[in-house]
């Protein structure tokens, strides 16, 4: 339990609880729940929008963001061929009570910042596995699913520019003396929703309503 005082928002209490249970040396369970507060600095945190030629409209008296967060995770350590396969799965749910909404849908030529009036939440599930195939070489894979929705002017929609899923595969090799390390990473970014487009003079949309998945190798 934590208490804070802000000269702008006054006194507030932040409760949080954590629970960990290890039934044996191979499986670990964790649960967490708590409340969080956050002051949003809209221009500093969304400065990429300043180069988009959108008109910026910031409402007065923006609230401090407030949300409940719940999480659960399980970690397993499985001995295979003298080495350990580590698998970790986790799920988090965030429910916003107060939030500063970044609205790029109401006006395709502008962006509005205002207090949430409705529901806003996110579900995130991620699974990760790592295994050292031989000395110095480790292969790690991860996959994440995200469902994030916010209410924009009375309509609850998927948050724009947020990928529905992401995948990552990393191969890492370190030389015997530990002087050099080489990494190869393959990343998959799933598609998502674009901000609402507008119609051009010929009736065509200014851009697609959704963007597709893409891969990146480095």
Task: Describe the function of each predicted region.
Residues 1-9, 22, 83-91, 125, ...:
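Face-selective signature of the C-terminal outer-membrane beta-barrel domain
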Residues 7-11, 61-66, 117-121, 161-165, ...:
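Short sequence motifs at beta-strands and strand-loop junctions characteristic
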